[in-house]
Amino acid sequence: MKSVLMVAEKPSLAASLAGILSNGRCTAKRGTGNGCSTHEWTGNFRNEGSVHFRMTSVCGHVMSLDFNKKYNCWDKVDPIQLFGCATEKKETNPKQNMRKFLAHEARGCDYLVLWLDCDKEGENICFEVMDAVKHVINNVYSDQVTYRAHFSAITEKDIKKAMETLGHPNENEAKSVDARQELDLRIGCAFTRFQTKFFQDRYGDLDSSLISYGPCQTPTLGFCVKRHDDIQTFKPESFWHLQLLAGQPEVTLEWARGRVFKKDIAIMLLNRVKEHKKATVESVASKEAYKSKPQALNTVELMRICSSGLGIGPFQAMQIAERLYTQGYISYPRTETNQYPTNFDLPAVLHVLKPSADFGEEARSILGDIQTPRKGKDAGDHPPITPMKLGNRSDFDRDTWRVYEFICRHFMGTVSRDLKYRVTTAKLSVGMETFSCTASVLIDAGFTKVMTWSAFGKDEPQPPFVQGTQVAINDVRLIESQTGPPDYLTESELITLMEEHGIGTDASIPVHINNICQRNYVHIENGRKLMPTTLGIVLVHGYQKIDPELVLPTMRTEVERMLTLIAQGSANFQDVLRHAIKIFKLKFMYFVKNIDSMDALFEVSFSPLAESGKAHSRCGKCRRYMKYIQTKPARLHCSHCDETYALPIGNVKVYREFKCPLDDFDLLAFSTGVKGRSYPFCPYCYNHPPFSDMPHLGGCNTCTNANCPHSLNTLGISSCVECPTGVLVLDCTLAPTWKLGCNRCDVIINCFKGATKITVEEAKCQECGAQQVNVVYKSDKSKFKDGSEEKSGCIFCSADFSHLVEKHRAVASRPVRSGGGFRGGKAGRGGGGMGGAAFGSGGAVTAGGGPNAGGGVRGSRVAKDKMGQLASYFV
């Protein structure tokens, strides 16, 4: 029997598809730690008859584009190189081992059916999956082996129809995504690296860890700053208008001239009107008016209404919509189309909604009088967003229900009658001047019966006038007003501008808006208004000063046009890339050359590093206090040496009076809280690792200096069981609260609370190979069961320690000390030790005192070149 591998985009989607295609008769098995289950059943496939189906999934993109490793060091690579350096595809989440998982599931399979989302990103993921299984499934790029399912909703009808009408992956659309990824990577990283380093080395209160540039993100910010500039430069202007009060009951009438901007003319016209005691009713006319029902719902309109009507930002709104889609409640939520297909079964959707306790009555009413929906735009991608399955209020959290209810009510509104009302207008003349009043009365609520937020409002009283009669003028007034500035852009208005200018896609628009918020370029105020920060304003003004095209939407619009040509097969992938990269490289060179123009704006708005922060710890070079700058990104700055040192994100304080034995910098203690990660570190070593095997931005728990009582060599206990290269290191920074922390991942083991001293000994556990420890308590506070003050043993195996250690992640510890150097290899339980580190002899840290190194030292390491770097200064 032949086998068919089928791959969906998300685990939940795979489960739904498998249930539908197998008619509920599939069996499931868990994946290998990546959250992706596999569902299996037997059924018929095309002309093959009975086959074995295997349905699994990925978790979004399998691969992501990045630069080669040597280009990822900001300090060593000139950003201009990023426009031409080599790139490579890397696994998006290496911990998931998705390529290995897919290859494993593809073993023995003869066909591949791809159920990825039906958009350009989905096409791109199709080819990532094909690449992962190409060595397992023969001839996987053949149309006779690999098939593509096209669907817009997770319903039995749609899914089974997609299975009967399988197509093939679209390579052109996949390439257009590759081109966009590469352009965004090269352009964004080059500008971001340069301006981040340039400005963070100069100013201390930028309050942003990354000063990013993005071909879509920056024009998006530009719209917000332009509106801010319009508000700031707005000059109010006075104007006047006449207001007439006439009749009984009294009615306020509006002046036909509207506004007059010259006061003397307004006074002259006022005096003319005052010459008359009565007004003549020239006409009283009534007519029916209509308010059109909405068009079918597309992504942009969904985001707009969620922001303006529900107070839910576009990023969160799309997360909710995608969750509703994967659960089968709505159709595919990313679509530009707002017109139903001619064969769309409108009554079927209403039948789905009939049983609802919240809007079932409206659905039943509309079923008896379905109206033809309005015409819209058919973008050729997916049908509009419609409800596919009935959900109840109790099925969702509050925001999810509100989005789902809106989608349901909007659909019902699109097949309802237009709102109809009657407008009565009365026109009166006073000399040469004309005044009028209007009143509206509802005739048919139409679609607003179900879309209650668009309700008509109260009926207005009809004008009490009869044509041809005269009415007494009760009063006439000259009203002075001033023009007002525009308001800040709302998210809804920004989405409209982005759509009009082709900035982003229906899928990426919410991401770009979210990015400018996270980068601290704008703040969201009441009413979902976007107010630019000082940093956002200065950035945009700086781009405008150097090269306005960097912030105008025209550049991105042109890039999107070229990407569309690739997707349509009308343009060559490499030609488009070369052309776009060449243009932006020239712009980058010009930007770097003229950066002083932008710096002049920053100088006015932000404080120099030397004037920022507060005295914190001593520099190892000049022994003066460095300034601690807490605004993002946190860093230390030595104004005497004019050097800046990056810090980890969290709480940083001076670690008692300890100093680094290599460079004499004060040691610091990093912590994210008692239950979080913590470790000591030297600010110089953290930024300039002294050993080749110490990672950049690593703490003392990654340093292999055998002469340091705080290093990995001294305080390492065992290899981490959760990650392949990590070591569990004793953390003494919060003593007498002690814990082991992995120096590579987030594994934490709390132990020996209240102990006064813990020493990592030379001896190893005979059972698991971990280093033994010596634990000391005060006599009146001992937590050993026999009341002893001091005991030695293995943290993980000793019965005396079992009640004092949280063993939830340390059951299968592996040894780390051996006679060899730092190799990073693996060994099984009790298998002779893992070359995690060549540990020196036991070091100890007491809760109240300094470090005590006991015994001799093995495996001493020589610093790579740090002492050479500092030699001239110390001499």
From Swiss-Prot:
From which domain of life does this come?
Eukaryota
Q: What's in the GO CC field? A: DNA topoisomerase III-beta-TDRD3 complex; nucleus
Give a GO molecular function annotation for the protein: DNA topoisomerase type I (single strand cut, ATP-independent) activity
> Which residues act catalytically here?
332 (o-(5'-phospho-dna)-tyrosine intermediate)
What are the UniProt keywords, alphabetically? Answer: DNA-binding, Isomerase, Topoisomerase
- UniProt catalytic activity: ATP-independent breakage of single-stranded DNA, followed by passage and rejoining
The cross-references to Pfam families, in alphabetical order and at most eight, read: Topoisom_bac, Toprim, Zn_ribbon_TOP3B
Q: Which residues form the Toprim domain?
A: 3-153
Q: Where is this region: Disordered?
A: 371-391
Q: Tell me which PROSITE patterns the record gives.
A: TOPO_IA_1, TOPO_IA_2, TOPRIM
- Protein family membership: Belongs to the type IA topoisomerase family.
Function of the molecule: Releases the supercoiling and torsional tension of DNA introduced during the DNA replication and transcription by transiently cleaving and rejoining one strand of the DNA duplex. Introduces a single-strand break via transesterification at a target site in duplex DNA. The scissile phosphodiester is attacked by the catalytic tyrosine of the enzyme, resulting in the formation of a DNA-(5'-phosphotyrosyl)-enzyme intermediate and the expulsion of a 3'-OH DNA strand. The free DNA strand than undergoes passage around the unbroken strand thus removing DNA supercoils.
Descriptive protein name: DNA topoisomerase 3-beta
